[in-house]
């Protein structure tokens, strides 16, 4: 095979700037208009790319939306401070920094509504955004178990729900403040509610 034909098969490398522009444009349009009004034409215009550039990356609007929402996860670092308390506080403070942003806060209500109406979209978001995020959070909890700070029979699914629940309840339902006080309170709730027996005795 010639080097020319080989290079054609390989194709041009993806442009990371275009990737980011497409996802940012998608998030901003969702926040402004909702998912039902999201159009690929508008994403292309806002991102300054052609529609073909988008369709080479995402086969459908659902795939694009799921990828855009999943990109929010990459903005929340998974800390390793050396202590379970430090990890949980930094983890929740990172989530607070992301979800009190105007774009991120604007995306979630429309996303939840769209997921309730569109099983295909719901599945795409759960398999991308939620599964990836929960796996990263579970790694932090697992370190807490291994350090002896969290109980050895920890119910990971329940603990993960407790980590995310208060933030999204305020974001979607009550409109309460999403701040470091909330972040620290959730971390403390995990540390006390799921503490190993020895850790509970040491904290008294």
Regions found by a protein language model. Give the residues of each.
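Amphipathic alpha-helical segments used for helix-helix packing
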Residues: 68-69, 100-126
């Amino acid at each position: 095979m010639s080097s020319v034909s080989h290079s054609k098969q390989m194709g041009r490398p993806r442009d990371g700037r275009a990737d980011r522009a497409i996802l940012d444009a998608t998030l901003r349009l969702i926040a402004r208009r909702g998912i039902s009004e999201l159009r690929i034409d508008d994403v292309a215009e806002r991102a300054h790319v052609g529609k073909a550039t988008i369709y080479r990356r995402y086969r459908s609007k659902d795939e694009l939306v799921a990828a855009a929402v999943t990109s929010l996860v990459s903005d929340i670092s998974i800390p390793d401070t050396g202590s379970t308390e430090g990890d949980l506080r930094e983890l929740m403070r990172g989530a607070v920094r992301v979800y009190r942003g105007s774009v991120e806060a604007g995306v979630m209500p429309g996303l939840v509504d769209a997921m309730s109406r569109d099983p295909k979209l719901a599945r795409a978001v759960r398999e991308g955004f939620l599964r990836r995020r929960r796996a990263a959070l579970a790694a932090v909890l697992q370190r807490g178990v291994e350090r002896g700070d969290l109980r050895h029979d920890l119910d990971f699914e329940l603990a993960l729900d407790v980590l995310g629940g208060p933030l999204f309840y305020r974001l979607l339902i009550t409109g309460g403040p999403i701040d470091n006080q909330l972040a620290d309170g959730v971390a403390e709730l995990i540390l006390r509610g799921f503490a190993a027996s020895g850790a509970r005795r040491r904290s008294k």
